[in-house]
C-alpha cells in the first residue's frame, strides 16, 4: 500500500551535526525506503535540523559536485538577476542544465534570488527581525501558483522560507516541494 509506505518513510525532526551527516542518512533512507516515480525515488514529509549549517561540505566522490560552482550559483541568486548570462559572468560559463531550463530570453524562473527580492521580501524579513526578534512572520514566499504556466521547465523546488531567531541565533525553515539530494543538497 503506497500510503502506508509513505507514512512509514516520514522522517521528522532528525538532528544532524552537519550537511554530510544529513546527506549520508537521507541517501541511505531513499535507497532503502524511497517510493519510485519513473527514474526518481522520493521520501515524503522529511524534516530535519542541522546544528552547524556552516559545515556544509558533503563527502561523496561519485557526486562530482563543485563547491566553486555552488558558490557561483549562490552569488547569482543573491544578485536577483534571473538571466543565465549573469551566472555566466560569475562562473565563467553557463551550465547546460540552465540553458535547457531558460526561456527564450535567458530567464530562469526557479532562480530564487529574483523571487526573494520580488516585493522586497528579503528586505522586509530583515527589518521584521531587527524590530521584533520574536516574530514568527518573517517569511519569504517563492512559489506562486498563479505563475504555474510560466514555470514550464523550471518550477521552483522551494515554496517558502521562514526565518526565526531562537536563543539569539538565526534559524531558517525551508519548505520544499522537491529537492534533488544528489546535486541540490549542499
Please describe what each predicted stretch is.
Residues 4-186:
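Terminal, non-catalytic protein-protein interaction segments that mediate quaternary/complex assembly
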Amino acid at each position: 500500500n503506497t500510503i502506508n509506505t509513505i507514512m512509514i518513510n516520514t522522517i521528522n525532526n532528525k538532528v544532524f551535526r552537519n550537511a554530510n551527516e544529513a546527506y549520508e542518512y537521507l541517501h541511505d533512507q531513499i535507497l532503502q525506503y524511497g517510493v519510485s516515480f519513473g527514474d526518481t525515488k522520493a521520501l515524503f514529509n522529511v524534516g530535519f535540523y542541522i546544528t552547524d549549517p556552516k559545515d556544509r561540505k558533503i563527502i561523496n566522490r561519485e557526486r562530482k559536485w563543485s563547491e566553486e560552482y555552488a558558490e557561483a550559483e549562490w552569488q547569482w541568486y543573491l544578485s536577483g538577476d534571473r538571466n543565465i548570462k549573469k551566472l555566466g559572468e560569475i562562473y565563467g560559463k553557463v551550465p547546460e542544465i540552465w540553458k535547457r531550463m531558460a526561456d527564450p530570453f535567458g530567464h530562469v524562473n526557479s532562480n530564487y534570488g529574483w523571487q526573494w527580492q520580488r516585493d522586497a521580501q528579503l528586505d522586509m524579513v530583515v527589518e521584521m527581525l531587527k524590530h521584533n526578534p520574536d516574530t514568527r512572520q518573517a517569511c519569504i514566499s517563492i512559489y506562486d501558483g498563479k505563475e504555474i504556466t510560466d514555470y514550464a521547465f523550471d518550477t521552483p523546488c522551494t515554496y517558502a522560507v521562514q526565518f526565526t531567531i531562537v536563543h539569539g541565533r538565526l534559524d531558517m525553515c525551508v519548505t520544499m516541494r522537491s529537492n534533488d539530494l544528489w546535486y541540490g543538497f549542499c
